[in-house]
Regions:
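Sec-dependent signal peptide recognition
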Residues: 2-10
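Hydrophobic h-region of N-terminal signal peptides that target proteins for export
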Residues: 10-18
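Serine-esterase "nucleophile elbow" of acetyl-processing enzymes
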Residues: 18-76, 86-95
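Catalytic His-Asp segment of secreted/periplasmic serine-dependent ester chemistry enzymes
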Residues: 21-23, 144-227
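Solvent-exposed loop/turn segments at secondary-structure junctions
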Residues: 41-45, 75-81, 105-110, 145-149, ...
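Proline-aspartate-enriched helix->loop->beta-strand connector
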Residues: 91-101, 105
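Active-site segments of SGNH/GDSL-like serine hydrolases
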Residues: 102-106, 129-162
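Charged helix-capping and loop-helix junction motifs
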Residues: 115-124, 157-162
């Protein structure tokens, strides 16, 4: 009986999260917001800073200097199974106001042998666990760029994993930040142009972060009237 009551309470908390204020509403009211970015090398280190730094700068410019801070809590080469294992220490312990998740590109890495079904379970677990542990935390899912060259060969079914992210965002009622179409337009200009943004064929550089990724994040999270 206690177990059933606990589960019902947890579900109630998760459901009420849909009606709570989000990142922008809190910034408008002058509340400091800490964003945790959780994912692969595309969201970590120099790659992550390439787009999170301008995103944070723009939000601070609009809503108040130093209101927005962020932590890059992911790790290069990791995938959603690692994400589940390290969620408590890397994300929940930081009590974030918003979390941006992306593991799709490495879930698709064939050597990790992570099926779309397992990746979906991992992603849904992370969303549910964050909602249960950190009330009022807004969650965003990211679909990143396509790789080219040998990096693409290691991920023959990447489209299926990215499709799962889109489906999960809709199912869970979280905001999807889908960069894929923008990167397709860059790639349509030719591989040489694409590599000016993604030199090694998989990791966007500072130019890619600032010119392709950051503007679309702001477009998705800011109210339409403020763009």
């Amino acid at each position: 009986m206690r177990k059933i009551i606990g589960i019902m309470c947890g579900l109630l908390i998760a459901l009420t999260a849909y009606g709570q204020k989000g990142l922008i509403e809190h910034l408008r009211s002058g509340q400091a917001q800490h964003i945790v970015v959780y994912g692969t090398s595309l969201s970590s280190g120099a790659c992550g800073n390439a787009w999170m730094r301008p995103v944070a700068a723009e939000l601070n410019k609009r809503y108040g200097d130093s209101l927005v801070t962020y932590t890059l809590a992911g790790k290069g080469g990791m995938w959603s199974t690692w994400g589940v294992t390290h969620l408590e220490d890397s994300v929940i312990a930081k009590k974030p106001d918003a979390v941006i998740i992306e593991f799709g590109i490495n879930d698709a890495f064939r050597d990790y042998q992570t099926s779309v079904a397992v990746a979906r379970l991992n992603l849904e677990y992370m969303i549910d666990r964050i909602r249960l542990s950190v009330q009022d935390c807004e969650i965003f899912l990211q679909v990143m760029n396509m790789p080219i060259g040998k990096s693409a060969g290691f991920r023959p079914h990447l489209a299926d994993y990215y499709a799962m992210y889109r489906e999960t965002a809709q199912k869970k009622g979280v905001t999807l930040i889908d960069h894929y179409a923008n990167w397709e337009r860059v790639l349509e200009q030719g591989e040489a142009i694409f590599r000016t943004y993604v030199p090694d064929g998989i990791h966007p550089n500072t130019k890619g972060g600032e010119q392709i990724i950051a503007p679309h994040i702001l477009k998705r999270i800011l109210p339409t009237t403020s763009l």
